[in-house]
A protein has these predicted regions:
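Positions in alpha-helical segments
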Residues: 24-28, 596, 757, 817
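Hydrophobic, well-ordered secondary-structure elements that form the walls
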Residues: 430, 478, 723, 759, ...
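Extended, charged helical/alpha-beta scaffold domains that provide interaction surfaces
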Residues: 303-310, 316-323, 525-526, 533, ...
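Generic detector of ordered secondary-structure context
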Residues: 22, 58, 278, 325, ...
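Glycine-centered loop/turn positions within well-structured domains
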Residues: 216, 428, 723, 817, ...
Length: 834
């Protein structure tokens, strides 16, 4: 009793019940309204919101409106428990509603209410079949009420996606939402952005998306490209240089071209100006070639082993197989040593579902099974799980688990149970964990001539069709545990008298939640049903947690006459299994929490860069942004040669001029007389003023729109080039720090510290290059923005049910090249097999 009084979920349940009672009280009044009067409620509510009222002020009336509209437009009236579910969702919580309780209809109430704000509502499903189905069916209701509905699918053009997102309500998959967010932060014109601000999302099967897929990153990677020729050309060029063509700092491992070196580069590559905007990428190749040839040393920093460059660990001297230098340096070394130059693929944008969905102003979710993960939902997403009561009592029979010594005996028993119940005509759904198990059981049923369907989740349309018929008399369906989520199994004629749907589990899953989902396929809306799990000591879960102990106990119950097994059916075994599942769930939660801690580092960095990118796209004039970057650069330049609070010496002035003259400023642009005998702060101010003079000079010479576009072109290209390299570098760092635990170091702390240093370097590089290019580049009349990442491919870091679609057609990879889909497999073992 006292637990209930202090339980947040219990309090929320009581709160939403009061709201449902208020909605119920309005039912008769709203039935009396004409269609026109009911439809007029939508503009009426919008006007009230514009006049300062909140969504909570109109919640009860809006729910009552949508409920009555559903009756008229869909022929379905939400029950009280569905109104309770909608109220829980509006509170930014998870409504746990059993299978068959009408989650889709429940969502319409809260979606309608929140769509009235005009800020957009996203309804999120796990696949495009469900998104299309729900948008089509529920769209009838929303359109009746005067709201617009969009469907965001993978195949749509950017224009079609933008139209879908601009609707009051948008149906989409979780994957497509995440990819669109990433792509929006790679565009080069603000008009190309498709998403609006992330306002409110209702996530169907929320446990699947926010728990099961939490560790799956969404990745947009640059497709495999053959850049060997560019690396070879850059290598050939730097090998032709003489000592006076470059300045080298062995201690800092830093090298730059001198004025003579830059002149040679322009002649070698036939360029007018090496520091022109369009040459950012080429300069990157040259810089890597310089480092490879004059900073990196064979048999010190790396060795050649079996025709490949292998890094030498600077601390242990051991070869670091499987590791690569990032940002193209490894390929530059391959060019230097004339070994095979491997194609580059790089991660150019990435985000996890954990971080994506936490960006919504408000987040809510629905599922039949969330209570077991309530702590995780609360701690990571700040969402409570509200258990919504069923409309009718659950009368399903959940039998005690039975356990066998061997897997063979278990499957024989399952086949016997299926055969016996099939003879009576009772429909049977058999849940398996793997396709392999499904095929094994299918083989056994074929031998017994029992007709059945097997689902492998490869075709959503076919899957939904089979599941929808799985409750008919005589149906036998074998499916993976997750198959058919989102589609109800309705009982056929005469099935209630046979005991309803029989669900048999072939083994226990690692997660109690998945087992509960399988059970929940039976006994919907007060229907009868029966569920039972069959286990053996050879099951994976049992092997991991003390199967030997069970084998000893089971040895006493083997039939002594014929040696056959007698299954054990004791509740103690079920409790043992549940205990094992809790341990695994705890481990998985810890793992997801750890992933989030790593992701937090990149999340903060991504927010800064994406924020800066948006400023570039949306500000009319970015001169203040550029000026701020130039100030930081000038301060750093002075600080690199002297104490900025002291007076500059002749020697320091000489060093400074060597660094800036011809590199950060046009040759001879800095007057030595203006910096001698000045304090460091004054020197930095002078350099900044010269930057401003160059800006002003460009502004006077060209029309204002051309000048503004010039700044945006340079800054976008510099930011994107370095950010994409940084993403790739952070990915490699994450792999590298895993080895730190062996050296008694905290890998997370190492990742945080090194990641912070890398980001500081990234910011400095962006500021430095922006200053260099803007000061030295010539403005052209036909300036065009150009996307840095080309031939990109979106992947979710896991095998998908449908073929991934590259954004642009690319060169066909070789059989042993990495597959461009981003799976990490060789092409011949992935998409090359199709």
């Amino acid at each position: 009793m006292f637990k209930g009084l202090f339980d947040a979920g219990y309090k929320e349940l009581k709160r939403v019940e009061k709201i449902a009672d208020k909605v119920d009280a309005l039912a008769e009044d709203y039935k009396k309204l004409t269609d026109e009067e009911l439809k007029a409620k939508t503009p009426y509510f919008k006007e009230r919101l514009q006049n300062g009222e909140t969504l909570e002020d109109i919640e009860v009336e809006a729910f009552a409106t949508c409920r009555e509209a559903a009756t008229r437009a869909l022929g379905m009236t939400p029950f009280k428990v569905q109104i309770m579910g909608a109220a829980a969702l509006h509170g930014g919580n998870i409504a746990e509603m059993k299978t068959g309780e009408g989650k889709t209809l429940t969502s319409t109430l809260v979606v309608y209410l929140n769509a009235l704000s005009g800020k957009g509502v996203h309804v999120v499903t796990v696949n495009e079949y469900l998104a299309t189905r729900d948008a089509t069916e529920m769209g009838v209701l929303y359109n009746w009420l005067g709201l617009t509905v969009g469907l965001n699918l993978r195949e749509l053009t950017p224009e079609e996606k933008r139209a879908a997102y601009n609707c009051d309500i948008t149906y989409s998959t979780n994957n497509e939402l995440g990819f669109d967010y990433l792509r929006d932060h790679m565009v080069i014109y603000k008009e190309q952005i498709v998403q609006r601000e992330l306002n409110f999302a209702v996530v169907d099967e929320v446990d699947s998306i926010l728990i099961d897929e939490a560790r799956t990153p969404l990745i947009i990677s640059g497709a495999a490209k053959n850049t060997a020729g560019t690396y070879q050309n850059a290598d050939m060029f730097v090998k032709s240089l003489k000592a006076e063509d470059y300045d080298i700092d062995e201690k800092a491992k830093h090298i730059v071209l001198t004025e003579s070196g830059m002149g040679k580069a322009e002649r070698f590559f036939n360029l007018d100006n090496l520091y022109d905007v369009k040459n950012v990428t080429l300069l990157h190749y040259i810089q890597n070639a310089l480092r490879a040839n004059y900073i990196m040393h064979k048999d010190v920093d790396y060795v050649i082993h079996d025709g490949a460059i292998i890094i030498v660990d600077p601390f242990t001297g051991r070869l670091m197989f499987g590791r690569q230098y990032s940002e193209g340096l490894h390929q530059a070394l391959e060019a230097k040593e004339h070994v095979e130059i491997k194609k580059e693929t790089k991660t150019v944008a990435t985000i996890t579902f954990q971080n994506y969905f936490r960006m919504y102003h408000k987040l809510a979710g629905m599922t039949g099974t969330a209570k077991t993960e309530e702590d995780e939902f609360r701690n990571i997403y700040n969402m409570y799980v509200v258990e919504i009561p069923t409309n009718k009592p659950v009368i399903r029979i959940d039998a005690t688990d039975v356990i066998f010594m061997t897997m063979k005996a278990k499957f024989d028993a399952i086949a016997n149970e299926i055969e016996e119940r099939h003879k009576k005509g009772q429909p049977i759904l058999v849940g398996t964990i793997s396709i392999e198990t499904s095929e094994l059981l299918s083989h056994l049923l074929n031998k017994r001539h029992i007709p059945h369907n097997v689902l492998n989740a490869k075709q959503h349309e076919r899957e939904a069709e089979i599941i929808s018929h799985a409750g008919e008399k005589g149906a036998v369906t074998i499916a993976t545990n997750m198959a058919g989520r989102g589609t109800d199994i309705k009982l056929g004629e005469g099935v209630v008298e046979l005991g309803g749907l029989c669900v048999l589990g072939t083994e226990r899953h690692e997660s109690r939640r998945i087992d509960n989902q399988l059970r929940g396929r039976s006994g919907r809306q007060g229907d009868p049903g029966y569920t039972k799990f069959f286990l053996s000591t050879e099951d994976d879960l049992m092997k991991r947690f003390g199967s030997e102990r069970f084998k000893t106990l089971l040895g006493f119950v083997v039939n002594q006459k014929d040696g056959s097994e007698v299954p054990l059916e004791y509740k103690m075994f079920s409790k043992f299994v549940e205990s094992a599942q809790k341990k695994i769930e705890g481990n998985n939660y810890d793992s997801r929490e750890q992933v989030l801690k790593y992701d937090e580092v990149l999340r903060k960095q991504r927010e800064i860069i994406y924020g800066q990118r948006n400023d570039i796209l949306f500000y009319d004039d970015i001169t203040p942004i550029i000026t701020k970057m130039m100030k930081s650069t000038c301060d750093r330049l002075v600080h690199s040669v002297m104490d900025i609070n002291k007076v500059i010496t002749v020697e320091d002035a000489k060093k400074l001029l060597e660094i800036v003259d011809g590199k950060y400023f046009p040759l001879g642009y800095i007057d030595p007389e203006q910096i001698l005998n000045k304090k460091g702060t004054e020197v930095a101010e002078y350099l900044l003023q010269r930057c401003k003079d160059l800006l002003e000079d460009k502004k006077e010479k060209f029309p204002e729109p051309v000048y503004k576009e010039f700044l945006k072109v340079i800054l976008l290209r510099v930011v994107d080039t370095y950010w994409m390299d940084h993403i790739d570098s952070m990915s490699e760092l994450r792999q590298a720090v895993r080895l730190q635990s062996y050296a008694q170091k905290n890998p997370l702390r190492e990742y945080q510290e090194i990641g912070f240093e890398k980001f500081e370097t990234l910011v400095c590089n962006i500021e430095d290059d922006a200053t260099k290019f803007i000061n030295r580049a010539q403005i052209q009349d036909n300036l065009q923005r150009e996307q840095v990442a080309k031939n990109t491919v979106a992947s979710s870091g896991k095998e998908e049910n449908t073929k991934r679609k590259p954004v642009k057609k690319e060169e066909k990879p070789g059989p042993n090249d990495p597959c461009p889909c981003g799976s990490g497999l060789k092409y011949k073992k992935c998409c090359g097999r199709k």
